[in-house]
């Protein structure tokens, strides 16, 4: 199987996470997407809801969407959510499957600052979500890596055996949604219905999350 992996704080999970994941799933013909909430994000100190609440919100989204599953291995880990550690664990859990780690271009351009970043290519393929027409600047430190490892969707369609170490770029529809914006709206008593799945909004309202 081809398995996509999308990690995040998901505080809360919203369409800005879900729609790009669905577009990647369709473009790369992935069988499944693992939605993976972080427990202790390396670059963030606090969250606005508990780990249990974020897990429940993601679990409910996965129940509502076909081909999405909750992955709680980072949430259960009592250490920082370093991607290389997670991918090693997932490689052991899915030894016969092909893993596709999904990230935005804003994360990819800073990939060299990640913990043991070069080992990521030994464990999975990297999927970089980008806005249509956007290109990495010539001379950028990650340009060589992108050029050397870039693979086309056509090459993927002719691939049968699981592989890793390739970079796929997928154009996605712009999503003007952020968790920060949603939390601010809720704190002011506004209901961001267009940004959240109904099941997520219902859970937030029942739990009184993010309300002042």
Swiss-Prot record:
It is an enzyme of class 2 (transferase). Keywords: ATP-binding, NAD, Nucleotide-binding, Nucleotidyltransferase, Pyridine nucleotide biosynthesis, Transferase. It comes from the Bacteria. InterPro entries: Cyt_trans-like, NadD/NMNAT, Rossmann-like_a/b/a_fold. GO terms for biological process: NAD biosynthetic process. SUPFAM superfamilies: Nucleotidylyl transferase. Belongs to the NadD family. Catalyzes the reversible adenylation of nicotinate mononucleotide (NaMN) to nicotinic acid adenine dinucleotide (NaAD). This is Probable nicotinate-nucleotide adenylyltransferase.
